[in-house]
Amino acid sequence: IELHPYLPQHALVSFCQSRDIHVTAYSPLGSGGSKPCLLEDEEVKKVAGKVGKSVAQVVLKWGIERGTSVIPKTVKVERLKENSMLDFDIDREDMEKISSLGVEKRYVPDFWNSGCFDE
């Protein structure tokens, strides 16, 4: 499921979790070549500065803290290492800020267009 702070799909995640269906976030970092760029979001940058981590690490940790798996794509060894260093916490207030950015941006085309959850 395409899932990141710009497309949190709260209803779909809640539906799945209420039925013990584990959710895996596809494209959890958004898409670097598309606008708006999640990794340039000012609110997420503030949280990253606060916890001393990269924006990508904060976004991945946000996904994990929500109870989802994240599968970021990278071809760079240094990013692969960075993406696995998620041994920090994001406080509740910052989790809520990230969860409510309100952008609603889908980066991956919705081929099925099911519209099940109106998101």
Tell where the protein language model's regions lie, with residue ranges:
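Beta/alpha (TIM)-barrel catalytic core signal, keyed to glycine-rich beta->alpha loops juxtaposed to Asp/Glu
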Residues: 1-119
